[in-house]
């Protein structure tokens, strides 16, 4: 028998994915039913070909799907053909100020070109030629509107880079590209303030079926930037908005990719990977949880399977969390109960907890399907 308590129905956490047109970036697709992709940007001088390709290789190994490279000079533009040819993932050329570099990037075989309508010289007058060359070459465009370089006309109209100002700029440029029958573009409307950024993307999502690239610009150092991007992305992705993401951090680019992938995994938008769940420790803990979690994480960092490992420090939440994991330990009184898929398989001394978990994890990994990416860590 069911009893109606008159409580409101619980909404689904994630709304259906917003329906967008699908565009091609090299060997990957963006929008439509394609997965949400993670993007980053190299921090090397693009003219340093070896260093740039090395960083792209590191990003690829970390799970990056698309990489952007800076093109601030003619020398950078002249080496793009080498970068684009040797990169393992699609390359987007980042162009500001000089329209000639847009054409150079298209000719170089880049998968896409990011154009900034706020600072490229006489940009509106260039769109016809850009659309013609990009269409002929099969190159897509990202219309990258940024609060820090908004069109002066819109700044005069709105007084500051408001959400509506960002959207007006993006919609205007999108309309010009479409007038030339060019539709292979995605749009970003980045702002340093997560609330303004969310407002802008919500407004933009209502205006057309363009794929959207999410980003909080100038997000800040690793901790602050992670919080800002995670907050904004979670809101938008939960509403079905977003087709590619970049977590902008004042940190090595690989860290951007790790955070981006973890945001997607946390929302169930990417396949789960190795996950270490550990308690934050408290006065009840009878073992050094921090040390155990760190040693287990280090010992399993090369595993590439969707395995959940719980490292718990006491008998309050420990047994429950350990039972819910694929593998876990509930510790106390100098020993640990080892759980495998909900069942206690043995009790070992504290000194044997880490070796036992590593042994069991590798055994379980051999029975599981292959996955890819970096391990994730959750503190519960």
From Swiss-Prot:
Pfam families: GcpE (PF04551)
Listed cofactors: [4Fe-4S] cluster
Entry annotated with the keyword Disulfide bond: no
GO BP, sorted A to Z: isopentenyl diphosphate biosynthetic process, methylerythritol 4-phosphate pathway; terpenoid biosynthetic process
Gene Ontology MF annotations: 4 iron, 4 sulfur cluster binding; 4-hydroxy-3-methylbut-2-en-1-yl diphosphate synthase activity (ferredoxin); 4-hydroxy-3-methylbut-2-enyl-diphosphate synthase activity (flavodoxin); iron ion binding
Cofactor detail note: Binds 1 [4Fe-4S] cluster.
Binding residues annotated for [4Fe-4S] cluster, in chain numbering: 279, 282, 314, 321
E.C. designation(s): 1.17.7.3
Keyword Iron-sulfur carried by entry: yes
Keywords: 4Fe-4S, Iron, Iron-sulfur, Isoprene biosynthesis, Metal-binding, Oxidoreductase
Pathway assignment: Isoprenoid biosynthesis; isopentenyl diphosphate biosynthesis via DXP pathway; isopentenyl diphosphate from 1-deoxy-D-xylulose 5-phosphate: step 5/6
Catalysis: reaction(s): (2E)-4-hydroxy-3-methylbut-2-enyl diphosphate + oxidized [flavodoxin] + H2O + 2 H(+) = 2-C-methyl-D-erythritol 2,4-cyclic diphosphate + reduced [flavodoxin]
Function of the molecule: Converts 2C-methyl-D-erythritol 2,4-cyclodiphosphate (ME-2,4cPP) into 1-hydroxy-2-methyl-2-(E)-butenyl 4-diphosphate.
Family annotation (HAMAP family): IspG
Family indicated by similarity: Belongs to the IspG family.
NCBIfam families membership: ispG_gcpE, PRK00366.1
Entry protein name: 4-hydroxy-3-methylbut-2-en-1-yl diphosphate synthase (flavodoxin)
Gene designation: ispG
């Amino acid at each position: 028998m069911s009893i109606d308590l008159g409580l409101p129905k619980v909404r689904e956490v994630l709304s259906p994915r917003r329906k967008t047109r699908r565009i091609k970036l090299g060997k990957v697709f963006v929008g439509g039913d394609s997965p949400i992709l993670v993007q980053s940007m190299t921090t090397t001088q693009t003219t340093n070909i070896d260093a740039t390709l090395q960083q792209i290789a590191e990003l690829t190994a970390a799970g990056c799907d698309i990489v952007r490279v800076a093109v601030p000079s003619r020398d950078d533009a002249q080496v793009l053909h080498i970068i684009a040819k040797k990169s393992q993932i699609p390359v987007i050329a980042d162009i500001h100020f000089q329209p000639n570099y847009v054409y150079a990037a298209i000719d170089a075989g880049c998968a896409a070109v990011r154009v900034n309508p706020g600072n490229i010289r006489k940009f509106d007058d260039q769109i016809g030629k850009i659309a013609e060359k990009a269409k002929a070459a099969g190159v897509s465009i990202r219309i990258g509107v940024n609060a820090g370089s908004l069109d002066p006309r819109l700044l005069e109209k709105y007084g500051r880079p408001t959400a509506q100002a960002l959207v007006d700029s993006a919609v205007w440029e999108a309309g010009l590209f479409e007038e030339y029958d060019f539709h292979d573009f995605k749009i970003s409307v980045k702002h340093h303030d997560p609330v303004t950024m969310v407002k802008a993307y919500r407004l933009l999502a209502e205006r057309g079926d363009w794929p959207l690239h999410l980003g909080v610009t100038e997000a800040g150092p690793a901790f602050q930037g992670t919080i800002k991007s995670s907050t904004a992305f979670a809101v938008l992705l939960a509403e079905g908005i977003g087709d590619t993401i970049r977590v902008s951090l004042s940190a090595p680019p690989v860290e951007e990719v790790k955070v981006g992938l973890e945001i997607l995994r946390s929302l169930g938008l990417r396949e789960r990977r190795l996950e270490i769940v550990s308690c934050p420790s408290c006065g009840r803990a009878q073992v050094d949880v921090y040390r155990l979690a760190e040693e287990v994480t280090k010992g399993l960092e090369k595993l590439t399977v969707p395995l959940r490992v719980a490292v718990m420090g006491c008998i309050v939440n420990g047994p429950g969390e350990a039972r819910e994991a694929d593998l876990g330990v509930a510790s106390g009184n100098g020993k640990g109960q080892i759980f495998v898929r909900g069942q206690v398989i043995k009790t070992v001394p504290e000194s044997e907890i880490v070796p036992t978990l590593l042994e069991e994890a590798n055994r379980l990994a051999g029975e599981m399907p292959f996955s890819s990416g970096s391990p994730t860590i959750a503190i519960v």
